[in-house]
């Protein structure tokens, strides 16, 4: 069944729209502009990046700095009745070693050829991403898995079952990497994260061009983009092309698992919760949640303690009395159904309010709206975003994971 594109709140009025953005400072070296990075303390992460040697030789050839002229970013609206032009435009740039923003069913991705280390280096530069945080490789068909990964015989049946159940879809598998995949893609790890997207455009581009590395199309640590306009706000002037494929269907980054075989049988190590829930995965094998300890090796994207964060501090309020408003401060409220929750009911003077699932209380709708609502509150000029928790079940586990990491950005 064809992927359904959901309309964005602000569709482009023209098929191609240029955008220019003034770059003020180096985006990967030590000169991190706090206004650009949202005060997420990423400068220290970059200074202490143990895998910087993987990145430096490639960055030196195409430095992105204050001396670099801004790029004319084109916003190309996909024609879902005939998207050959869309695919052709994206593939042509990828073959030139450029990066492009592409829609997926989860969030928009920033794509580059997975086998071209110099092109992959541009992803890290544009996103201001430390090289110890690995990327996800997107393939265009199931059979392409063997081009980027090696499936051990002991888990082949398990992997086949996962692929049959959840590909194309929002499930990423961490497997031993193929020798052709550059170390930069995997942050020097012997494993690679792979998925087959359910979005026609991402999948078709990967079919025509070949496997592509594509993390979320935003600056590192910030809110993931679920619309083309959000990508433009984040990366306009830094990349040549954004494909507008509508709002993302799932709204949260993919679930990441590492299939393994133990003495007691197959186990799915859950590295990042996402749209494919723990309950879904348990139908196939035992699931073990992996919680990264401080200083531990990052095994997959999205494991940093601070991530997915607005520039505005965020606080999750779970009990009455946890939040006491200060006079003269402006507050934004992120509610689940719209009531504000029992602990917040007495505080009604909110500068801005966003509701994840108005009146319905549906976790699936809350997941789709999460990043949009956070962006709206972040732009509202408040001093603090107060977030109400959601049920820690199904996709609610992934929602709470994102909120906790967003809150950790401003301890």
PLM feature spans:
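Active-site-adjacent structural elements in enzyme catalytic cores
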Residues: 58, 63-411
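Alpha-helix boundary/capping motif
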Residues: 7, 14, 31-34, 40-41, ...
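N-terminal polybasic/positive-inside topogenic patches
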Residues: 42-50, 56
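Serine residues within intrinsically disordered or low-complexity segments
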Residues: 18, 26, 44, 65-68
């Amino acid at each position: 069944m064809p992927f359904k594109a959901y309309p964005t709140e602000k569709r482009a009025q023209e098929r191609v729209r240029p955008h220019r953005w003034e770059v003020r400072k180096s985006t990967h070296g030590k000169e991190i502009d706090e206004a650009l990075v949202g005060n997420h303390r990423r400068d220290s992460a970059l200074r202490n990046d143990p895998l910087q040697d993987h990145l430096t030789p490639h960055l030196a050839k195409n430095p992105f700095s204050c001396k670099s002229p801004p790029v004319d970013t084109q916003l190309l609206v996909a024609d879902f009745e005939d998207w050959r032009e869309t695919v052709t435009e994206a593939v042509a740039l990828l073959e030139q070693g450029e990066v492009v923003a592409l829609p997926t069913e989860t969030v928009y991705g920033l794509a580059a050829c997975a086998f071209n280390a110099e092109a992959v280096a541009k992803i890290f530069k544009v996103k201001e991403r430390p090289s110890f945080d690995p990327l996800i490789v997107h393939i265009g068909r199931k059979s392409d898995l063997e081009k980027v990964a090696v499936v051990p015989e002991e888990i082949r049946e398990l992997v086949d079952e996962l692929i049959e159940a959840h590909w194309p879809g929002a499930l990423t598998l961490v497997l031993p990497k193929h020798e052709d995949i550059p170390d930069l893609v995997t942050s020097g790890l012997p494993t690679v994260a792979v998925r087959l997207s359910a979005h026609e455009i991402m999948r078709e581009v990967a079919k025509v061009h070949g496997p592509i590395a594509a993390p979320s199309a935003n600056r590192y640590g910030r809110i993931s983009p679920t619309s083309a306009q959000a990508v433009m706000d984040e990366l306009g002037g830094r990349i040549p092309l954004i494909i507008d494929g509508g709002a993302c269907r799932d709204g949260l980054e993919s679930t990441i698992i590492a299939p393994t075989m133990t003495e007691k049988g197959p186990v799915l190590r859950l590295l990042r919760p996402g749209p494919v829930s723990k309950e879904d995965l348990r139908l196939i094998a035992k699931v073990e949640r992996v919680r990264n300890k401080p200083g531990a090796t990052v095994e997959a994207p999205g494991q940093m303690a601070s991530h997915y964060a607005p520039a505005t501090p965020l606080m999750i309020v779970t009990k009455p009395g946890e939040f006491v408003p200060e006079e003269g401060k402006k507050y934004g409220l992120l509610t689940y159904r719209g009531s504000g929750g029992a602990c917040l009911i007495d505080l009604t003077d909110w500068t801005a309010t966003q509701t994840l699932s108005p009146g319905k209380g549906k976790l699936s709708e809350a997941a789709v709206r999460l990043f949009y609502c956070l962006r709206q509150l972040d732009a509202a000029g408040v001093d603090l975003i107060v977030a109400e928790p959601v049920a820690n079940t199904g996709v609610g586990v992934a929602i709470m994971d994102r909120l906790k990491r967003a809150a950790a950005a401003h301890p």
